Amino acid sequence: MALRLEDKQAIVAEVNEAAKGALSAVVADSRGVTVGAMTGLRKAARENGVFVRVVRNTLARRAVQGTAFECLAETFTGPTLIAFSNEHPGAAARLLKDFAKGQAKFEVKGAAFEGMFIPAADIDRLAKLPTYEEALAQLMMTMKEASAGKFVRTLAALRDQKQDAA
């Protein structure tokens, strides 16, 4: 189906706007995925703050020009699904990685984070980033363990002093 120039410009503007506000992006090949599965993916994406769009390659290249995701231009071959994480850098990577487990034909092509290209083989690096809440919890656990360890060392030093004095 041929798109009019105005429609193409609207798509480029929409994807460019999503790219400018995004923390990371993931590109995938959705060839062979059923409509029902894609609908489920889009629903999960909305729930996780991820913008998902199937875009023509030339329009995708134009949309990411001048953004941190320009490094993805080489992955725009064949059917292209692009997902932008808006709330958490690893959200799109995690979502598409989990979706690919249930879809044999779904293939992640690559990702970008802070202007750096991440190959599909290394997508786990981005998917395993902790959320803000998880990072805070890890920080609190580290601080708690450090203070408990310091307390134990203080008690051990006090015990050693008393043993030396006796």
From Swiss-Prot:
Coiled-coil regions listed in the entry: none
Any one GO molecular-function label of the UniProt entry: large ribosomal subunit rRNA binding
Keywords linked to the UniProt accession: Ribonucleoprotein, Ribosomal protein, RNA-binding, rRNA-binding
Biological-process GO terms, alphabetical: translation
Function according to Swiss-Prot or TrEMBL: Forms part of the ribosomal stalk, playing a central role in the interaction of the ribosome with GTP-bound translation factors.
Family: Belongs to the universal ribosomal protein uL10 family.
Descriptive protein name: Large ribosomal subunit protein uL10
Source organism: Shewanella frigidimarina (strain NCIMB 400)
Gene: rplJ
